[in-house]
From Swiss-Prot:
Record's protein name: Mitochondrial distribution and morphology protein 34
Assembly information from the UniProt record: Component of the ER-mitochondria encounter structure (ERMES) or MDM complex, composed of mmm1, mdm10, mdm12 and mdm34.
GO CC aspect terms: ERMES complex
Region spans: Disordered: 212-236, 321-426, 477-522, 553-572
Membrane topology listed for this record: Multi-pass membrane protein
Species of the source: Aspergillus fumigatus (strain CBS 144.89 / FGSC A1163 / CEA10)
Biased composition range(s): Low complexity: 330-348
Gene Ontology MF terms: lipid binding
Gene symbol of the encoding locus: mdm34
CDD domains to which the protein is assigned, alphabetical: SMP_Mdm34
Residue ranges occupied by any SMP-LTD domain in the UniProt entry: 1-195
Compositional bias of kind Basic and acidic residues: 371-381
Length: 572
């Protein structure tokens, strides 16, 4: 059985070639193009030649008047040619950088400048050989499937034939693309062409789609920037009038796209300058973080701090290294909030500050809420045992309220509770580490000395009524101490009227010499001998504390091992 192919009608039909060119153009641009090709591939010329292909029938599966199915062996070596036109990238470095990740490639300035060159390629001298499965039907058209790669060779002619490496590169790339074309795209192209020839419904549908596409594409394109703004300026920022705007066109040298609004340009320039200089008058923009802050409160809010500038901190701090030495009375200061009994040690400028008793001062940065109770205290039964906790304290900050919740002492009803206020005229003395030793190791000795001094006070009589103010005595010792003030005769009168409460009166000694309490001008007169006796007793205690300086810097637990008596809180 032999077949005779009439190849001449295919060469004469012009519409067939036009349709085939469109299908080939769509097929060549559908697949991923190599990076060297930077434009669409357009088929400008197509010619199937005058030599038909050679077909050898290997198998016929179905044969009828309107259908056919068979397997052929095809060989072609004819004069068909194909001409393509596109644009290529002539700079290989630009192509290399585009195909590599940005973090792994260098950043040349001028070497990677793109250079596109138009390219025309002609494909000829096709040599095909392969097995083809051919299925024909008048209702479904022709289906051609290649079982193997039919392309053996072809000739590629281009405008770069004089450059050997460019010619070889194009030859290799085009062959790779044509192999994909024959295996994937060519069967679809042949099937669509056969439907156009033998199926009228398909032809009518394609014509309708073509008319719709042409109707949508009619009319010139509208340029959104064709209408100039209300206050246009040229590229140099000079304002233009209406006559100059009318003389301009899209085809002139001065484009209308450059006519921007002068008002908007000024706003953009001001915004750019303010952002560059971090000005505080930067226009507010939504979802923008500014590096310049208008006030410190903005920084506090931005940093997420919970500290509010409207709520003052209750703890008072002092910048001096050592504050005033004092004898605070636990009966005149009441704390509304008990502190933790766990000893927390704070390092001062001269050594380890242990505070008063076992309850040391908390960390300086910790905010404390202190409340001074100005109400009259209530009488309690255990008042005589509480005043033993009065001690000599040294701290690196201002005098604070007692470090533990204490009961209230029994005092006169006409004697108000005075809050601890720091006087301005008192002497600020440096902190002495030895005094912390005495505040822990010798509480019993302080109680005995206080009892002896108050008993001597009760035996003495006032010698004169002319002295109405406190007498301050200087100590011959080098150790500094606080000023001693004379309170009124209320303590003496209280000792005479209530002999049963002599123990309670004896424990009010720190209240009489507390420097925070103002002098009472209407009180009695303290004898000069009493003041000298008190000053001598204080000087003797200071000298005793000074002799124990060798053990002041020792470990904290060694100090407890050397205690002569238990602390005030556990002495009874």
């Amino acid at each position: 059985m032999a077949f005779n192919f009439n190849w001449s009608p295919l060469m004469a039909d012009a519409s067939f070639y036009t349709r085939a060119q469109d299908l080939l153009t769509a097929a060549l641009n559908k697949s991923p193009k190599p990076p060297i090709i930077v434009d669409d591939i357009i088929v400008t010329e197509l010619n199937l030649g005058s030599i038909p292909p050679e077909l050898e029938i290997l198998e016929i599966g179905d044969l009828a008047e309107d259908r056919f199915r068979g397997i052929f062996k095809m060989s072609y070596s004819g004069d068909a040619f194909l001409t393509l036109k596109t644009r290529v990238q002539a700079n290989p470095l630009n192509t290399y950088l585009l195909t590599r990740p940005s973090f792994a490639t260098p950043r040349p300035l001028a070497a990677a400048t793109p250079l596109t060159i138009p390219l025309q390629i002609t494909l000829s001298d096709f040599k095909l050989s392969g097995f083809v499965i051919l299925v024909f039907s008048k209702q479904k058209g022709i289906t051609v499937v290649f079982r193997n790669d039919p392309l053996e060779s072809l000739k590629v002619s281009s405008t770069f034939d004089s450059i050997p490496f460019v010619r070889d590169f194009l030859q290799k790339e085009i062959e790779a693309q044509l192999r994909i074309l024959f295996m994937d795209e060519l069967p679809a192209i042949i099937h669509r062409l056969s439907l156009r020839l033998w199926v009228p419904e398909y032809r009518a549908g394609e014509e309708l789609q073509t008319q719709t596409a042409s109707a949508n594409g009619e009319g010139p394109g509208q340029d959104p920037l064709a209408s100039p703004p209300q206050d246009p300026v040229d590229a140099l920022g000079n304002a233009l009038n209406e006559s100059e705007i009318e003389s301009l066109s899209l085809d002139s040298s001065v484009e209308t796209h450059s006519l921007f609004s002068q008002k908007n340009l000024l706003r953009l320039a001001a915004l750019t300058d303010s952002q560059r200089t971090l000005s505080l008058f930067t226009p507010s923009i939504r979802e923008v973080v500014y590096r310049a802050w208008t006030s410190p409160s903005d920084q506090t809010d931005a940093s997420g701090s919970v500290t509010s500038p409207f709520f003052p901190v209750l703890s008072r701090t002092q910048s001096q290294v050592g504050s005033m030495s004092s004898f605070p009375d636990s009966a005149s200061m009441v704390s509304s909030q008990s502190r933790s009994s766990t000893p927390s040690h704070t390092f001062s400028g001269y050594g380890l500050s242990l505070g008063a008793g076992r309850h040391s001062k908390a960390h300086a940065r910790k905010r404390k809420k202190r409340v001074v109770d100005l109400r009259r205290p209530k009488t309690t039964d255990d008042a005589p045992s509480v005043s033993d906790e009065s001690s000599f304290t040294e701290s690196t900050s201002a005098p604070s309220i007692c470090s533990a919740p204490l009961p209230v002492l029994d005092e006169q009803t006409d004697d108000p509770v005075t809050p601890p206020l720091s006087p301005d005229n008192d002497l600020h003395l440096p902190a002495i580490p030895e005094r912390h030793r005495m505040s822990i190791s010798r509480p019993a000795l302080r109680r005995e000395n206080a009892s002896e001094m108050i008993r001597d006070t009760a035996e003495c009589k006032p010698s004169s009524n002319a002295v109405g103010q406190a007498i301050q005595e200087e100590d011959l010792s080098a150790t500094p101490r606080a000023a001693v003030r004379a309170h009124g005769a209320s303590v003496l009168e209280k000792g005479k009227q209530d002999p049963d409460s002599s123990a309670g009166s004896s424990r009010q000694l720190p209240s009489t010499i507390l420097p925070f309490i103002n002098d009472n001008p209407t009180g009695g007169v303290v004898d000069q001998a009493l003041v000298e006796r008190l000053a001598g007793e204080i000087a003797r205690r200071m000298r005793d504390e000074k002799f124990m300086a060798s053990n002041a810097c020792g470990p904290f637990w060694d100090r407890h091992s050397q205690e002569e008596s238990p602390p005030p809180a556990y002495g009874h």
